[in-house]
């Protein structure tokens, strides 16, 4: 019984007496096996029936007995039938599913290779060097491990595990009020608007040491755990009683003060400013008189006046003495200030090209103290030196170049440090900056009125010039085209 098989038998090529043939063939097929159906599954010229055989030999006997046999005018075709469409579809569907899985895997691999190739092409050198590709974890993290989040990274060929430190200070919650916002940080405590402690900043577990290597010596600095543990803020130390005392004292001080009444200003500073302005106006008037003086004045007279120090008005002297008493600060003073009034271009150019005629001598001193440490007994007389040199040259009979005149001005002691007025280059720059072109200041004084008055005419002129330029360019282009 273990060798019992069931087969679907195909009977075909039946064109004559189909009903009689099917009824007689059913009885004859029963001799070789057990027919599972009471009749054939009929179609146009063929039929099917399921028969159970004891072994394969019974099926072979049946096929030899009836295949290619003439039966009632029909040449029979008997053989094992092909499986029905449902079974074939099931087998083919299972086969297709397996093939689809393989094809999808191949397609994914191909698409991934193409994606990585395009991503590699789009990356810059910095991305190739610094960006490290990672992946998202597939399984969710356990609840007990949420506080100890780590990540793995490939460092120099070895896999390292690092801990993700919490850097977020505070977040946003929808059901919280404005006073619940954490905004105050005092004594390593985060506090909200109600002055409640929300979070504590504690570095006791994260003790680190810093080492500085310097050859054979090493300096190690460790972090103290109890730093700022006993210190408190001034706001924390201040009790309510002290705050009330301070408020009472401020109330007593400001009780009788009228905030609406304007305060009276001290006019001492304004008086000093008015005196300074008066002195400056007087100096400007004197400078204007000197600039507008006739050109044929005696030059020696101007030299003598320039060498002598200018006398200050009495008011300015008193003011300078008062300033010296208030502020003991040394301020270098010069003999002559640059005038801010009217400027004469002729006088400026004359001073520029003849600087030696009226060059002011500076009274600038680098050190205010007297030169007590200088031995003036050993000073060399310049006239005596010139006479000795001339006598020696006469005795030798040599003709030498004249000795340059050495300045004996006592004020020029600090040869390394000299004021602006004694520098030939800077004086020239200053004089050139005073030269002004005539009429430049009044050129654009009434520019708005002139623009709105001539706007239409100027626009028409510009358009006409533009048209002429375009015509001229077209003519040139047409001529060049004809030549080609």
From Swiss-Prot:
InterPro entries: NOP8_RRM (IPR034138), Nucleotide-bd_a/b_plait_sf (IPR012677), RBD_domain_sf (IPR035979), RRM_dom (IPR000504). The keyword Phosphoprotein applies. Keywords: Nucleus, Phosphoprotein, Ribosome biogenesis, RNA-binding. Its main location: nucleus. It is found in: Nucleus, Nucleolus. Gene3D superfamilies: 3.30.70.330. The modification Phosphoserine is found at residues 234, 239, 268, 370. Coiled coil: none annotated. One of its GO terms (molecular function) is RNA binding. This is 60S ribosome subunit biogenesis protein NOP8. It comes from Saccharomyces cerevisiae (strain ATCC 204508 / S288c).
